[in-house]
């Protein structure tokens, strides 16, 4: 039997305790729970690579603002489900400053981390048109987003973008959209875990096809502006973070505080709905809720059913971080550039191993 750092029977027994039939399909959280249990039982420390925890300190700007908010008694008050006005304003400014897109504060909605924003987006998109009951993933992406759809009982399809870069993406994407059952497209850009970035040409294809087939694009910007091959840190100056928002009005941008601002523990993000989409009514939403637009249903029906608002104090933190970044007082990318350095080292290691495998 092959020797391993941890006795195989210990891992097998732990997996069996969780009653996981196919470990290859375990969620990130299940992998973490099993690793923690095996670590305790064996006494052998595990190197955790299943969670995106780079060990960076949280933004001092955010911490200071949140402490002040708590000291002022904000914890006793329910947050407005629409979001803190200051945060909505600064999120709108942030999108203009770093993406060069105009989007009203009204459509910038605080959420309990981008995961909640994605969950609410999936629900809302899937209810717009009864004929469109499927979400399309341009992979690789965030595995838990598929788990969210499994929890909802919603359908999804997926393809890996690796073989469909550039103009090839159009034919592949259209092969799904022309079926008429896709309600939304979701992808991550910059991408985790592959660290690829979609090009302007590819974003244009996605945007134009989304408009043609009347599909909503969910753009996951968790690793905002982390294409360290160019400097995207200067507000209101090119180059800007590439976005599908330049090519369609059918979009929701998912901004996260977890990675760009190392504020993962407080679960804060902003879902930014385009002005046109926010005010658009859909027959499916009218039938289900008796009225409302995409934006009002997203906030006052779906989000409200998930939570009575997003952490009040964390909204003050996010507002302060965005404001400082918008005004050029806080270069948030300087604090997270280690992501790029580590990615570069990993790429070198992977390429070196591939080279050895072919020797």
Where are these regions (language model features)?
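Generic structural signal for small/hydrophobic residues in well-ordered secondary structure
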Residues: 31, 49, 66, 91, ...
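N-terminal small-domain helix-loop-helix segment of the aminotransferase-like
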Residues: 4-11, 17-116, 167, 322-326
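Conserved core segment of the aminotransferase class I/II
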Residues: 247-337, 348-355
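Conserved small/polar residues in nucleotide/adenosyl-binding loops
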Residues: 357-359
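Conserved core of the PLP fold type I
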Residues: 71, 75-213, 218, 224-247, ...
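Short aromatic-enriched loop/helix-cap "lid" or pocket-rim segments at secondary-structure transitions
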Residues: 59-63, 150, 228-232, 264-267, ...
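A non-catalytic, amphipathic alpha-helix used as a structural packing/dimerization or gating element
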Residues: 30, 86, 90, 301, ...
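Short catalytic/ligand-binding loop motif for oxyanion handling, primarily in non-cytosolic enzymes
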Residues: 55-59, 193-196, 225-227, 260-265, ...
